[in-house]
Amino acid sequence: MTFNLGRRAIVAGAVAVLSFGAPVLADGHKVLDSIHFLIPGGAGGGWDGTARGTGEALTNAGLVGSASFENMSGGGGGKAIGYLIENADSNHGTLMVNSTPIVIRSLTGVFPHNFRDLTLVSGTIGDYAAMVVGKDSPINSMADLISAYEADTSGTAIGGGSVPGGMDHLVAAMVMEAAGKDALGVKYIPYDAGGKAMAALLSGEIAALSTGFSEAVDLANAGEVKIIGVTSDDRVSAAP
């Protein structure tokens, strides 16, 4: 069975004010003395990893003197968005990492603020979504997951590191819809970022996990989980 779903969100940095108080230089010279990353989710998730990886890359390249990080969970990213907008004047050197749900949830009225109140600075990564199960799970394929869902819809819980209506939830629902099942019937369990969601999968709390491919591939290579589906048009060589 083939599932041809959309690609996972491209993660972008967002900043309320673009004045960093330092001149922009070129040719490998330092651009900023320091930069602060506001992360709208918990530790170990995709936003967290992207922010810390970006900060490390900027400092290692000598473009930024130092990078600091702050996790601010709540409201599916809404707490951090509201904080950055409402405190823009005191956050000139702050970047917030986010992804497609910032647009989706703004358009659906979930956030009291609008993504247009922020300035998108850059796209940093693109990632596929992946459906993942534990190494000892009897589920070995997407067909197995669909069969388990058919047999016990409420007992086949799918977790994710985003709130209901977020990207992980949407991907799980799209999988079931593509298989001709009721997308609204998915029992989705949200966790505060991908790290906690993965821990729930490893402990057997959920039957499957909807997450970013990059968040699962290392554990899959280590034999701790099985990637049973990826939202790419073609097979991914890292998870054939």
How would you describe each model-predicted region?
Residues 6-11:
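N-terminal export leaders
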Residues 26-117, 181-208:
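N-terminal (or domain-start) structured segment
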Residues 38-42, 128-138:
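A bilobed periplasmic-binding-protein/Venus flytrap-type ligand-binding module shared by bacterial periplasmic
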Residues 215-240:
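C-terminal lobe and pocket-closing loops
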